[in-house]
């Protein structure tokens, strides 16, 4: 049955590999179950309701990805978009969280239309292969940087923006132990991968978590909520209280539009739409490139199904009570473990569904245990750099700017925007437009990106 649905042999994989890959993807994404409620509750939403909505929206989106596209990509409410939802739309602009959900819902409807009319697919195919390879590398650096941050290996600095963690004095017990455990986790995971241990990334997460538990039991690791270092020992395993979901479910349809200008509403909606569109395209490009899923023309077969899954999940998430649901770059961790079909994503989706019940257990997975997986995934995605034509400055410079922008701007969509603008203008100004056969859609995207920077 699984073979018939997911075509495992055709994709050179098996059930065990797909299950391990799906579990790995979930483990690297599980942090969203804790982070999303924390961020959205700042807007006045009930945290428990958001937790359940996050789990269900992730299940819906990821299961649809498995069934509609047969790809190993997982979806969940996107980081960055949730912060924009709470801190900008609600707290700064003064709109209700119900109206913010309506903006997300409308964005999802527009995406469904764009996916049905192949507009999103056309944008994907219009991006030149050099930039697609650069996006994959840029996402790798971005994911690794997120891992370093999650592990507290990189911290804020007033003088240099960021700096490495210091391992001396009281800092060791307050924050440093988690950072040290993350470094140990990177080494453990690397050894497992060098030894070609199947499921090495997943085992690396679990071993690092166990080491954290031992450190907490012996007093070496001291939980400190103010520093973002929580207990790694589960105090309970299950919860059957689902009543909180009623506080957010369907609230999107009770939006009060009085006093809200139509232009202001569409400005908010467009911001969600822009970031979601290019974050999703960037993730699909990057992870698909890593998995060798792109054909010789740089196109992704069955992309329409993947984009429909993403679009429907956004609408479903808004109805359930969460911000924009999007494809996660952490999907690359499952791909690195060998995941190649929808069985990987279905496994991840089922785990998100189970998280509704087992949330107390999943919420104790520490960030220092999943950080090594993200760092190692970053390494694996560097391979796409070999496909970039660095000997041609017209190709290499835009690719470099794309790679540079993603971790430094902390945004996949910004990296794509800078790459598209620089590639189009550089080839146009130097008279290479005819030679490179620049798509009309690339000109349109370039103009839209420039207008975005000028007007927004």
Model-derived segments and spans:
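Alpha-helical membrane-protein architecture signal
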Residues: 12, 16, 184, 266-270, ...
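Loop-to-helix transition at the N-terminal end of transmembrane alpha-helices
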Residues: 44-63
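Helix-loop-helix hairpins and the membrane-proximal interhelical loops
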Residues: 1-49, 165-168, 205, 209-303, ...
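Helix-loop-helix junctions within the multi-pass membrane cores of secondary transporters/permeases
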Residues: 2-36, 57, 78-87, 91-139, ...
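Hydrophobic/aromatic residues within the transmembrane alpha-helices of Major Facilitator Superfamily
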Residues: 23-30, 63, 67, 144, ...
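Membrane-embedded alpha-helical modules
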Residues: 93-210, 346-456
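Residue-level signature of catalytic and energy-coupling elements of molecular machines
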Residues: 19, 39, 123, 199, ...
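Juxtamembrane transmembrane-helix boundary signature
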Residues: 58-79, 110
